[in-house]
Amino acid sequence: MSNMMKALVKSKPEVGLWMENVPVPEVGPNDVLIRVKKSAICGTDVHIWNWDQWAQKTIPVPMVVGHEFSGEIAEIGSAVTRYHVGERVSGEGHIVCGKCRNCRAGRGHLCRNTLGVGVNRPGSFGEFVCIPESNVVPIPDDISDEIAAIFDPFGNAVHTALSFDLVGEDVLVTGAGPIGIMGALVAKRSGARKVVITDINPHRLDLARKLGIDHVVDASKENLADVMKAIGMTEGFDVGLEMSGAAPAFRDMIDKMNNGGKIAILGIAPAGFEIDWNKVIFKMLNLKGIYGREMFETWYKMIAFVQGGLDLSPIITHRIKIDDFRDGFEAMRSGNSGKVVMDWM
């Protein structure tokens, strides 16, 4: 194996990514080197491409980015015992310290010292990625490489949707991006009564309909209260999944929640994001922030959802070769795509 590989690198502090030859990551005693077969583009990667304020504050330059992937093990460290060369795997992109209170209590997703693959350390937009053995997730034979490559965002959706009991509940999802749609699918499959998803992007709304969401609302044209009445809802929503990061959508959600309703919040809010906190108080709402996946219960559940028949393939709207990565990022930046999966093989 050559000691060099091609990778997408944030090599300059400006808009874009660049394909370069970089050293293959070194494998420590407890590490696993994975030959990447498929990579998916995340919204985080778009922020890095755009070199926005968050990226400028967060991403060291140069950096191999990317964190959504699947592949097979190419090399294992001397102390690795659970995996073998050639095994099909994906990986958890949040690397935790294992020493803080939350880690030692089995709540690794709450680690204060989390490092992000492709954010704080070299990522998966390369021919190889190296992660600790503890972050490796084996992929069953009945799950394809491209579905495994989108398990990271699917895990965000599963973590968000399963934050609260859904059986018999009426659920509102604000934001029909890929994660919002997958969250709505999880809610529907988990026994929710009514599942309503809202957005203002026609392409995303069409994609939600294509994937079988029953009640798809264009918030720029339709009144949510009228939709609730039309589908037989006499009280507010029991559970809200906020995936948009848009203040108008979140405010509308708060207005439409039943007293005592529960809201899981994954959408990242911009500066100046304002809501009416008196409504939160007097409606006695329960708000929960979500970041990443619960390790590794969320992974177990998302694998089970797919093996149980949940078809995520329509959420992948673009399949491209890695050398055409610019086309993939253009599709993502347009807002008119679902997931974009890039083939390294």
From Swiss-Prot:
InterPro entries listed in its UniProt record: ADH-like_C, ADH-like_N, ADH_Zn_CS, GroES-like_sf, L-Threonine_3-DHase, NAD(P)-bd_dom_sf, PKS_ER, Zn_alcohol_dh
Class in the EC hierarchy, top level: oxidoreductase
GO biological process: L-threonine catabolic process to glycine
Transmembrane intervals: none
Domain of life: Bacteria
Cofactor stoichiometry and binding remark: Binds 2 Zn(2+) ions per subunit.
Enzyme Commission number(s): 1.1.1.103
Pathway(s) served: Amino-acid degradation; L-threonine degradation via oxydo-reductase pathway; glycine from L-threonine: step 1/2
SUPFAM superfamilies: GroES-like, NAD(P)-binding Rossmann-fold domains
Binding sites annotated in the UniProt record for Zn(2+) 1: 42, 67-68
Chain positions of site Important for catalytic activity for the proton relay mechanism but does not participate directly in the coordination of zinc atom: 152
Intrachain disulfide bonds: none
Protein role: Catalyzes the NAD(+)-dependent oxidation of L-threonine to 2-amino-3-ketobutyrate.
PANTHER family linked: L-THREONINE 3-DEHYDROGENASE (PTHR43401:SF2)
Protein name in UniProt: L-threonine 3-dehydrogenase
